Amino acid sequence: MSTTSTLPGASQQSPGAGFSEHTVEAGGFTVRYAESGAGEALVVLHGAGGLRHSRALDLLAEQYRVLAIEMPGFGQQPNETHETMAQLAQSVAVVIDAIGLDRFHLLGTSFGGAAAAHLAIARPDRVISLVLEAPAAFREGSTNPAEIPPEQMLGRFRTHPERVPVFLPPDPDFMARTWPLVERLLGSRPVYDQELADQLPRLMVRTLVLFGDRDGIIPPHNGRTWRRLLPNCSFILVHDAAHDIQGDRAEAFTDVVSDWLARGWQFLLPEQDTLINP
């Protein structure tokens, strides 16, 4: 295992400045992860854009031991072995074992949300609670990011693209390494993951599903599919947020997620006919 004080390129003001970088050998991959904070472990699985830091993760690290894992195939080594999201999730489980975690909360974003759901199914005894941010397993009405013109990409991911000082397009080398994996596990698959749908009703882990009400990648109504299939699921729409909820509404995202992790159902109003529910 190797460690650095902060992630490369991070200043004291930039997201991720308080995270240290580590690597573990697991399943034939050298896997990088970033860690910050103390308390109960919160494992974070990134989206198709790879491991990135956000103010939301900085805020969560004030209350939890946050471990953001770069999934196999998103680092310097291509992943040519995994054919399904379930296989990728099993490899992530091996990484978590190598890190030495027993029980943990689990947060997955978009592509990582689909992986997190499969991981929770594979290791339900290890996952304390599950948070899925715009998860990509059910994508009715969605748009493949590869088909979005570059000039429209930021607006699909962020509600207020004008607030992003500089938008850097994806690195071509990174895309060449990772996109075949993304397409193989997600892009070329049906928009409805039937295999996952068949297993979710047996997953008793308490789950929070969040979508931005202006998501331009995966329409937020797909959150209702998760709520219908999962026995212990709550679905929340975050106002004035697009696909990247952490980027659009960092404080709101952190407030909802931290309350859910700490208090579970006690932080939510029960659904009633007299209340407006998603």
Question: How should each PLM-predicted stretch be described?
Answer:
Residues 57, 205, 219-228:
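Short alpha-helix in the alpha/beta-hydrolase fold that links the catalytic acid
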Residues 114-122, 128-160:
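Flexible "cap/lid" loop of the alpha/beta hydrolase fold
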Residues 203, 209-211:
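Short beta-strand/loop motif that positions the catalytic acidic residue
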